[in-house]
Structure formats: structure tokens, C-alpha cells
Amino acid sequence: MGKIRKLDDQLSNLIAAGEVVERPASVVKELVENSIDANSTSIEIHLEEAGLSKIRIIDNGDGIAEEDCIVAFERHATSKIKDENDLFRIRTLGFRGEALPSIASVSELELITSTGDAPGTHLIIKGGDIIKQEKTASRKGTDITVQNLFFNTPARLKYMKTIHTELGNITDIVYRIAMSHPEVSLKLFHNEKKLLHTSGNGDVRQVLASIYSIQVAKKLVPIEAESLDFTIKGYVTLPEVTRASRNYMSTIVNGRYVRNFVLMKAIQQGYHTLLPVGRYPIGFLSIEMDPMLVDVNVHPAKLEVRFSKEQELLKLIEETLQAAFKKIQLIPDAGVTTKKKEKDESVQEQFQFEHAKPKEPSMPEIVLPTGMDEKQEEPLAVKQPTQLWQPPKQEWQPPQSLVREEQSWQPSTKPIIEEPIQEEKSWDSNEEGFELEELEEEVREIKEIEMNGNDLPPLYPIGQMHGTYIFAQNDKGLYMIDQHAAQERINYEYFRDKVGRVAQEVQELLVPYRIDLSLTEFLRVEEQLEELKKVGLFLEQFGHQSFIVRSHPTWFPKGQETEIIDEMMEQVVKLKKVDIKKLREEAAIMMSCKASIKANQYLTNDQIFALLEELRTTTNPYTCPHGRPILVHHSTYELEKMFKRVM
């Protein structure tokens, strides 16, 4: 007798449930998506004990006809596709016909539904077995209740997390759906307490305000672009509003929320040097395309997709974001306090430099006043950064925290915890007392971010503090400038161009510099010798596991040549495959930091003025290459308010 047998339907559904129904959030996702596919304009979600005890979804959609009710709970039964061609033209959120039978097989399920033109149907299913079916009076739409989830699979139940965690997973899913479909009114309740209410008026910014707070909504930059194959719309926050997790970026493809790392990476690339390392924006991006260009039949939960023209899409996203930021003055408002935000965030976190050849740039430098001693340098094709004069030490000594730029800037080591989004501020919570109408009014009153160019306004220096910060003013108020970050940006744009166009101008080292490597590192570097010449690293093999450097580009920061070579080699060794574009970027950032003014370095008025004028000529005068702000702004009104001149 053969050993292979066909499994019965109930066991097959239990196995399928293991893929489709991982936790209560999976149930909520599948049922709410079914409601949206049924043309619902209003959906209510009621939870008890984070859905482990009870999940109830009520919608005003098309409903299910009586003759379809039983069929709907059979495996691979669906109204959304008919043949294999439909699989490549999917516009609905569901299409496999697996969700309902999988959910019913591991729960006690009750369904009341009506199409509106006939009596409704009442259906009770327990563990996949139909217990009751009868006609009933019902309004148009569907009311489905799932109780005692995983009652017959105790092993699965044992691996559920705390109620708080499971509720977080559900709110995360509901928030993404709300952003994906702002035309649908969504209400989310937990133990009879309202957690979310969206109006369904189609305004995604209002949904974002409901989820992230009105303060975040005020910092949103609209994004919109179109190509032959793609249309993208959405909002991203100004660079000053960041989080420690990518989880606050939502990508929507043809109305479906998807998790796609390359799309998130494209959003990050759109910010290029505007964000600190390890920080991420809040963003929502909706992408419309021909269904033939995207494969959604990849993941059981339909969260992962594959694109046919991925590189074209990524380029469109990057260029659209970069173009948007070039129209905005990205000076953060110093009047905004961030202490509370950081505290809130710790809770929520559960939850190519190939330019066309321009004219040869001159090395940015700070002009020394006449009469100052200046060290004579050997004549070079490109002049190195001038050493800034520093006065004798004063009695006052700066706090140790100010002397911080001697090393390359490093991001905070605060651990990043990837968890679902949690609300920053619930506009519909009972204790807050906010109503949906009030939120709508708040959103309507938000002023659009001005997009009339990102040129730095003229600044008139008035002093320096602690040898680190420059104070300047204009008719709009007071500006505080980090002098190290400012010159770092100037130097970065200079070195970025130089590293991208390695010239024949090299300088011989008096003593060749030897680099010893392990065998693995040596072999990895040996493969990339020709590529490394493109970034100014000229290596000659010396022995079995060593290289020597006899010369370097003239634009290497003077006195730091060997240090630059060492750090560039470290970058090469760390990368399994050398990405020249990335290596050029890292090299430019590293050299710009080392060649810039340090903290506790006093400048004359002429030097300060020259620094600010040089900063104004950069393409991005608002952040250093590491993404830290260069300057912050106190408006005249804020200052008057601080001194009680206005109330």
C-alpha cells in the first residue's frame, strides 16, 4: 500500500492557516481588505483583548449573496480572478481565496451579510465546520466576527505576544490601510475605546495627522511626479523630523501596502546628506502603475512584490524628492522643542558623482585678514585649506562636550527597535476630547510649505560663541551656525567633485607608505586596483600580502595623507564588492570632516564673513554631509515672545 495520501480539506486549511493567519493582525488585514474589495466606504473594527478574544469587522460594502456564502469558505474560491491572465492584471487586494477558510479553520466565526436586494445570510462556523446557516434580516454589507482565535491550535496560541504587542501589530496594519485608502472611513476600537477615526474624505494628509499628530502634518512636503509607466504621489517630512526606524515609511503600490526595502532606500537616497546616519523620515508614497509591471503573487500575506522596471521607478522617486527639497529653505525652527518628541519616540519604537565636467573648482578656504602670519606652503596645483588662526587661550574653557569634531562624526548608539507604529497623539481618544471635525479644521488651516527656492538668505554675522557657533541676523530673525558643519559642507562639495574627477596632479611621498593586510584582505584589494585608481588610491604590490603607496592626489588634506589612505583602505576591505560611487561618497565625506574647522577655534570677523559667503554658494547649505543641521533659526516673533514683548 502506498504511503502518499491526499490530505482532507480541514487539515489542508489548518496548514494554510499557518501561512496566512500568523496572528490577530493577519485576520484584521485580510478581513478589512475584503471589505475594501467589496467597495465599502465605511469600515468599523472592534477588538477585544487585542483580537485574541474577539475581532469584529462591520462594513457597508456589496455583501455576499446567499449562494456564495458557503463557497466563500472553501479553499481557493474567489470572485476576483477567473483565469491565469487575470493573475497578471490584479487590481484587488485579495485574489487567492485562502483567507476566509484559513481564518474559519482556527476560530469560531460568525457571518451576517446581505447584498441589499434579498434577505441576509447568517452563518456560524467553528474550526472549519459549519454549525448553522439561516436567512436573517440584515442591512446591506457584511458583519463578520472572529472569536477565540487559535482555540484548536494551542501551540500557535502559546507563541502569541503580550496584548500590548499584538494590539501594536494590529494598529500598524490599520494605519497602513488608512493611508492606502483615505477615501474609506475607518474606525478602530479596542475594548470599546476608540483608537482611530478617519473621515474617508480622500485627504491623506488628514489621515497622517490622525496617526502621527498635527505637528508632523505641518512638516509634510508634498511629492508628485509622473512618467510613462509610473505615477507617484505622497508626503514626506522635512529633514528636521526623523525617527530611529524605517518603520515610519509606508509604500503603497496600486492601493496595496507593501514592504519593499529598495523603495525605502530610494526615499532615503532622495534625502541624500539631509538626514543624520541612523535616522529616517516619516513618509507616505503611493505608486500607481500597470498591474503587468508588478507581481503581487510572491508572498502569502501579499506584502512583498516584484517590479519589472525597478530601476526606472527608483530613479523617479530619488529625483522627485531631490527636486522637491531644492525648492525649500531647509532651516529648522529653533522654537520647536524636541525633548518630548524623543520621549514619545522611544515608546513608538516598539512599534553618483559622475558630473559633467564643470570648470575646475578652487579649494574652499577662509580668507585670512591682512597682516596675519601665514605659513608658507610648497606650491601645489590646488591650494589646501588654510589653517585658521586661533587666539591665545582665554580663562574660560569650553565644556568637554563642545570639543567633539576631532573625530569623524558618529551617529547615536541608541539601539533601534523595529516595532509597529504607535500613535503620537490620538485625536479621537476620550481623554483628549478632540473630535474629527476639529482635526479636519486643523488640517485645512495648515499652510503649505513654501517652495520658492532653497538659496540661503543673506546673513550678517554678529558674533561667535565658545569658538564653535556663529551668530548672524537678518530681517527674519537670529541664526545660529555650527562653524564646523558649515565648512564641512563647503569642503564636501569640493572633494566630491575632485574625487569624481581624478586628475594627473599627484604628489610624491618622501617615504613610500606601506600597507600590510591579511591574505583575504590582500586578495580582495588586488581585484580592485584599477577601480581604486579612480578615487585617487594608487597601490603597488609589495611582497605577498602588502602594498605600497608612492604618490597621492594633490588635493588630499595636507598632513593627513596617510590617515586618508588608511581609512579609504578600510572602506575597501569592508565591502565585498567595491561600489565606486559609494566609495567616492565616503572618501569625500571623510576628507571634508578632517579638513574643516574644529570646535573651540576662534575666527575673526573677516573669516566668519568669508565662511558664510562660501556657504551660500553650495548646493545644499542646510546640512553637513552627515545630515546634521548647519544652522537653526529663531524668528523675531519667537524672541519677542521669549522676552514677553508679545503674549
UniProtKB/Swiss-Prot annotation:
GO CC annotation terms, alphabetical: mismatch repair complex
Family: Belongs to the DNA mismatch repair MutL/HexB family.
MF-aspect GO terms: ATP binding; ATP hydrolysis activity; ATP-dependent DNA damage sensor activity; mismatched DNA binding
Gene3D superfamilies to which the protein is assigned, alphabetical: 3.30.230.10, Histidine kinase-like ATPase, C-terminal domain (3.30.565.10), MutL, C-terminal domain, dimerisation subdomain (3.30.1540.20), MutL, C-terminal domain, regulatory subdomain (3.30.1370.100)
GO biological process: mismatch repair
PROSITE patterns associated with the record: DNA_MISMATCH_REPAIR_1
Disulphide bridges: none
SUPFAM superfamilies: ATPase domain of HSP90 chaperone/DNA topoisomerase II/histidine kinase, DNA mismatch repair protein MutL, Ribosomal protein S5 domain 2-like
Function: This protein is involved in the repair of mismatches in DNA. It is required for dam-dependent methyl-directed DNA mismatch repair. May act as a 'molecular matchmaker', a protein that promotes the formation of a stable complex between two or more DNA-binding proteins in an ATP-dependent manner without itself being part of a final effector complex.
Species whose genome carries this gene: Bacillus thuringiensis (strain Al Hakam)
Name recorded for this polypeptide: DNA mismatch repair protein MutL
Keywords: DNA damage, DNA repair
